[in-house]
Amino acid sequence: MGIRPTLQTNPLVDLLISTSQTQLQNAGLPFPPRSFGCLLVRHSPGCLPGSLWNLPRSRLPSCLPICLPRCRCWLNRERWRKGDDVFSDFCTKFVSTLIGPTSFAFRFVEFFYL
């Protein structure tokens, strides 16, 4: 998918990058058109927790952009939280398929329409 991480790689990032179209389809998840994507938001000073829509664009290079199927939801260590827009079984299934229920290297994850 031509992804170049901007942060030091870790097992979660490696898992997301190595997830292919076939793997997603085998998991019952549709692969997105190129016009869709998401950002993994790292919980760090350069990538503040909160809404990406309020994050200054100049701060985005310190985050980690990854191309993933479309959906919008929030994930944190303790529980799923309903976001302002779409929260669906698709989001839950997609994130739990890729990351698993207990393995979080990133505290906040948001999937959204580009």
Curated annotation (Swiss-Prot):
Expressed by the venom gland. The keyword Disulfide bond applies. One of its GO terms (molecular function) is toxin activity. Its main location: secreted. It comes from the Eukaryota. GO terms for cellular component: extracellular region. Keywords: Disulfide bond, Neurotoxin, Secreted, Signal, Toxin. Contains 3 disulfide bonds. The keyword Disulfide bond applies. It is found in: Secreted. Belongs to the scolopendra neurotoxin 8 family. This is Putative neurotoxin 7. The lineage of its organism: Eukaryota, Metazoa, Ecdysozoa, Arthropoda, Myriapoda.
